[in-house]
UniProtKB/Swiss-Prot annotation:
This is Ubiquinone biosynthesis O-methyltransferase. Gene3D superfamilies: Vaccinia Virus protein VP39. It comes from Azoarcus sp. (strain BH72). Keywords: Methyltransferase, S-adenosyl-L-methionine, Transferase, Ubiquinone biosynthesis. Pathway: Cofactor biosynthesis; ubiquinone biosynthesis. It catalyses: a 3-demethylubiquinol + S-adenosyl-L-methionine = a ubiquinol + S-adenosyl-L-homocysteine + H(+); a 3-(all-trans-polyprenyl)benzene-1,2-diol + S-adenosyl-L-methionine = a 2-methoxy-6-(all-trans-polyprenyl)phenol + S-adenosyl-L-homocysteine + H(+). The lineage of its organism: Bacteria, Pseudomonadati, Pseudomonadota, Betaproteobacteria, Rhodocyclales.
């Protein structure tokens, strides 16, 4: 299996996996951001009836949200514990999602051009070779299919907000959640997409108000941002 993965990163999320669906846990920011990213994805591609792959699905927050919107969803991850939590939560939600323990690269080798929509959210900044993941996501999308990414920009403001602010001042995330050196500039992600045969459709920032604790779409891509790309062909 091509595992383009940092074992320490996989272990970090495995250790917290049992708290994935607790909205007051370390995953609180994911719970707060999920409705926004779900609406954004659905608004761009129309999830109902689509065959969707969620890369780096973790405990299944986004996967279940997309299944709830009528998509036929598969989720892949390299954390067995996170996938166990995701599968267990299906009993509570009554939804259907096919979860598999595999990497994007390994799945791409056996599932080329299989999906109408591929999502890879809050994951690229946690792998050693993000360009490889982007390429794998592109491989798995059907020609004309939609591919979505979200990650963190790499600049001083992103360091202040996503690392110093979120991890040390506001305690929104456990310390060590993010490695600033792995943050990705929009220009870099755009280049990865072009090299993988993807055409950039839309770029949107996300901002967080610590007072109202609400995330909102924004033109400001300095910290969190999302990309919608389309597979050429």
């Amino acid at each position: 299996m091509n595992t383009n993965a940092d074992p320490a990163e996989v272990q970090k999320f495995s250790d917290l996996a049992h708290r994935w669906w607790d909205p007051a846990s370390e995953f609180k920011p994911l719970h707060e951001i999920n409705p926004l990213r779900l609406d954004w994805i659905d608004g761009h591609c129309g999830l109902a009836g689509k065959k969707v792959l969620d890369v780096g699905c973790g405990g299944g927050l986004l996967s279940e949200g997309m299944a709830q919107r009528g998509a036929e969803v598969s989720g892949i991850d390299l954390s067995e514990k996170a996938l166990g939590v995701a599968r267990l939560h299906l009993y509570e939600s009554g939804l259907q999602v096919d979860y598999q323990l595999t990497s994007a690269e390994a799945h791409a080798a056996t599932h080329p051009a299989q999906f109408d929509v591929v999502t890879c959210m809050e994951m690229l900044e946690h792998v050693p070779n993000p360009e490889s993941t982007v390429h794998a996501c592109a491989q798995m999308a059907k020609p004309g299919g939609a591919v979505f990414f979200s990650t963190l920009n790499r600049n001083f403001k992103a360091y202040l907000f996503a690392v110093v602010g979120a991890e040390y001042l506001l305690n929104l995330l456990p310390r060590g959640t993010h490695d600033y050196a792995k943050f990705i500039k929009p220009s870099e992600l755009s280049r990865y997409c072009r090299n993988a045969g993807l055409e950039l459709v839309s770029l949107s920032g996300m901002t967080y108000n610590p007072i109202t604790k609400v995330y909102a779409l924004s033109r400001d891509t300095d910290v969190n941002y999302m990309v919608h790309a389309r597979k050429l062909g």
